[in-house]
Regions:
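Terminal, low-structured helical/coil segments at or just beyond the last alpha-helical repeat
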Residues: 211, 216-269
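Structural signature of tandem alpha-helical TPR/SEL1-like repeats
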Residues: 47-55, 80-92, 115-127, 151-173, ...
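N-terminal leader/linker segments that initiate helical-solenoid repeat arrays
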Residues: 17-70, 79, 88
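Short coil turns that delineate tetratricopeptide repeat
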Residues: 30, 64, 98-99, 133, ...
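Canonical tetratricopeptide repeat
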Residues: 38, 72, 107, 141, ...
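TPR alpha-solenoid repeat register
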Residues: 69, 104, 138, 184, ...
Length: 269
């Protein structure tokens, strides 16, 4: 009897010690920073940017190593046009342990693209692809960065073509991970045209068009599809689409005038 009680007492002590080791008390500053972060994120979602910035700045001040606090703080700064401060916070998040966080690199790639710093955007997108190859955003951003780099190198035809083909491969991978993403499909079609692949571009435009109700596709889709038909010398179909473009009052737009010239030139041949 005594032996059983003794063993039971030892078990209780062992469990108690284990629980004590696994439990880490939350400090008052951690509790307050978590509360301020939740308030800041809620304000950010509601578009109350100044309030979000203040709350998230408090959260970061109280818990400097929480990368999610910094990521949301950076977003609040960015949406107010404080771009360099935002980039600083994201960079600080990476330095404080977020170097393997794909979301941080995705956010940086997005922001550097807006600032037209395409090489830096490509570097962060490339890192995001390495860290999380199943996230379509990583591939899309890397493809976008390459496409924009190619557009800046118009004088270097061979290199531009190589970069554009690399961009196409990234877009194809992104679309395979997010097949109904309308923005991605439109960009892929444009890249396919740039790569001299109008047949593939037309297939992409048709896939994109199928995601809308009949006649409900955006002007960009209708014009892109019609331009591609013209390049393929399918002028009867292009002229049929042109009638819809005229009904929408787009014939005098820059794209409309360019398209009208393409169709007219083809019809005269």
């Amino acid at each position: 009897m005594f032996r059983s009680v003794f063993i039971y007492s030892l078990l209780i002590l062992a469990v108690g010690c284990q629980l004590n080791r696994s439990f880490t008390p939350i400090s008052p500053s951690q509790f307050i920073s978590s509360e301020r972060s939740q308030q800041g994120i809620a304000a950010l979602e509601q578009g109350k940017l100044a309030e979000a910035e203040k709350s998230l700045a408090d959260a970061v001040r109280l818990n400097k190593n929480d990368i999610n606090y910094r990521r949301h703080y950076a977003e609040a700064l960015w949406q107010q046009g404080k771009h360099q401060e935002s980039l600083h916070q994201l960079g600080e998040a990476i330095r404080r342990g977020g170097q393997n966080n794909a979301s941080l690199h995705i956010s940086l790639a997005e922001k550097y693209l807006v600032l037209q710093e395409h090489s830096t955007a490509h570097r962060h997108a490339d890192e995001a692809v390495r860290l999380d190859p199943q996230d379509y955003r990583s591939w899309a951003l890397r493809g976008r960065a390459k496409r924009l780099q190619a557009s800046q190198q118009a004088g270097y035809t061979e290199h531009m073509a190589a970069v554009l083909h690399q961009a196409r491969e990234d877009y194809l991978r992104a679309v395979s991970l997010s097949p109904n993403n309308r923005e991605l499909l439109a960009e892929l079609a444009a890249v396919q045209m740039g790569c001299g692949q109008p047949e593939q571009a037309l297939a992409t435009w048709l896939t994109l068009q199928s995601l809308y109700p009949q006649g409900g596709e955006p002007d960009e889709v209708l014009i892109g599809k019609t331009e591609t038909l013209s390049v393929l010398r399918r002028f009867n179909e292009a002229e049929s689409n042109w009638a819809t473009i005229q009904q929408r009052g787009l014939e005098n737009s820059e794209a409309g005038q360019r398209l009208q010239a393409m169709i007219g030139k083809g019809a005269r041949r």
